[in-house]
């Protein structure tokens, strides 16, 4: 994880969101989705909100001392499964069609411990000014 820290120190963009679904990932300090049948559409509201937030945020699947669970029935790690569900709209708490880092973290920090019998707890670290946007719900 020291390599990740070194990379972060060399980067100068206004916004960085680093997401890690790996065991002991809590020790670490925008993508558009489209399917063959549906084109990705980016709204003006999404672009406006995307350009406002500033900061560096790290979302990890678990605390530094925890193992990140993989579940065959979910097809992913538990954290990734609930993060993807959140980006599909379940994390959009205010129903504005935009999922922010805070909304996604709030969603996974509730769902992941529930699904793992309180054995795994996502972590959010970093400094943010305003809201950082992760995605738009279609």
Across the structure, where does each feature detected by a protein language model lie?
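Cysteine endopeptidase catalytic domains of the caspase/legumain-like
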Residues: 1-138
């Amino acid at each position: 994880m020291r390599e990740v820290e070194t990379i972060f120190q060399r980067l100068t963009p206004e916004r960085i969101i680093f997401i890690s679904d790996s065991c002991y990932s809590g020790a670490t300090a925008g993508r558009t989705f489209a399917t063959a049948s549906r084109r990705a559409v980016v709204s003006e509201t999404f672009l406006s909100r995307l350009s406002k937030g500033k900061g560096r945020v790290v979302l990890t699947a678990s605390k530094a001392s925890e193992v990140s669970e993989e579940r065959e029935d979910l097809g992913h790690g538990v954290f990734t499964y609930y993060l993807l569900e959140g980006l599909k709209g379940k994390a959009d708490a205010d129903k504005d069609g935009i999922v922010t880092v805070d909304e996604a973290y709030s969603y996974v920090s509730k769902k992941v411990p529930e699904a793992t019998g309180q054995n795994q707890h996502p972590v959010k670290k970093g400094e943010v000014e305003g809201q950082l946007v992760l995605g738009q719900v279609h």
